[in-house]
Amino acid sequence: MSTADAPKKPRETDDVPVPATLRKSLKNRHIQLIALGGAIGTGLFYGSSESIALAGPSILLAYLVGGFAIFMIVRALSEMSVEDPKAGAFSYYATRYWSKRAGFISGWNYWFNYILVSMVELSVVGKFVNYWFPAIPTWVSAAVFLVIICAANLLGVSKFGEFEFWFAIIKIVAVIAMIVGGLAVIIFALPTASGIKASFANWFALEGGFFPNGLMEQTKDGTWTGLLMALVVVMFSFGGTELIGITAGETEDPRRTIPRATNDIIWRILVFYIGALGVIMAVIPWNTIGGDDVPSPFVQIFDSVGIHAAAGILNFVCLTAVMSVYNSGLYANSRMLYSLAKQGNAPAYLGKLNAKGVPVAGVLTSAVITAIAVVVVFVWPEFAFNYLMSIATIAGIINWTMIMFTEMKFRKVVAAGGAPEDSELAGKSGKEALDAIHFKLPFAKVTPWVVLAFLALVVVLMCFSASYRVAVIAGVIWLAILFAAYQITQAKR
């Protein structure tokens, strides 16, 4: 048979009936925007009001410190993803380089974390819808958007990538437009609703200056405020950046794409968090940010200068941001369940794919459980955001802790000559193997311990807040459940 007559290898797209496997259909532009979309959502557009109230202008330092920590966490994960790109990312890596127990705990905790994050997103959807239509119950909005995003995730990974790409584009354009608009208000001294001239000097002009609540201080009603307490809210905002690792198994060229997306994180933090909030606090006095009538400081900045149409547009952007994070969350959860099933740590049906390479059972299972948020929003609307966010934060910290420990285990295995057979590190050991790692974690002997110490500090700080204290207790109970569940599943085998 001639070369011309030889059957061509099917191309991995969602429209070609190739054998059921995860498709490597995500391109560089998808990965770049997915990484951005997963981290810019409720924490920035909605939760930033709370963090500003806690720390005032010094919140900018909190985002800088927290951003550095999360950047190093993603660098650690990306080090492994580049060498061994697999679906399930750190659950697979924890199993491969640490232990089966670690993989079980890491995978199920990540799934639990993103279930909670998804619930948080759904719990605030109604607030943005109510900006235009105050009569619509918040639980109705949550239910409608849950169905829409679930349907999008069933279309195939390339379709998911396109959805997320455009969601993220909307957010990027909007935040940049907000920054430019805010700078115009400052430069041209446009009048504001507060009557205070817009200026970066406002960071220092109000009572208390740049650190109005200090590093940490207790108010008369017993609550704690200050820069350190704001770190807790800040870390929730950064949840989702590790999604880069989850996408590695469905990325066309992970060795080129993953490092580029990872290194761009630091610029996203500087522009989209520090830059945006810095401009907002220059235009709006920080102690007037927030309130039930205006659900986000990003909306409030345009309301403050009388541009109500732009405020409505920003409210739409906030809504798409929430949908984007839930879209990413449902994607990540379905892939994690798929990976857990392939490892034997979840029911086998969750490891099955349809003809388009979509883990349908994982998508539907995660969506149904996330639907609990609709009930929570209906029954306890005020409870929903704060408590769900606090529990999601502790679950996220557990994830990040597992990633850092797994990275150290990964290096030990690689140094001992245990690199994957299909890796360029195969056959190498010791310093030669470690030097051959393509995308190294900077200062790898020290960085994991510095990050772990920082995460431990955040957990200690959580104990000073009533709602977060509940989350810490819930986190301990959740870990105990995971340990017990692993032992039970092993005993049955």
Question: Could you say what each language-model-derived stretch is?
Answer:
Residues 91-96, 101, 121-142, 174-177, ...:
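Helix-loop-helix connectors at the membrane interface of multi-pass transporters/channels
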Residues 17-22, 59, 137, 169-312:
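Helix-loop-helix junctions that connect adjacent transmembrane segments
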Residues 1-48, 53-55, 70-75, 84-87, ...:
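Membrane-interface "cap" regions at the ends of multi-pass membrane proteins
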Residues 22-23, 46-141, 145, 265-274, ...:
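Extracellular loop-to-transmembrane helix junctions
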Residues 86, 109-124, 233-251, 308-348, ...:
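Membrane-helix boundary/coupling elements in multi-pass transport proteins
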Residues 186, 384-399, 441-493:
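A generic transmembrane alpha-helix motif of multi-pass inner-membrane proteins
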Residues 166-167, 349-360, 400-467:
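C-terminal membrane-solvent junction of multi-pass transporters and transport-like membrane proteins
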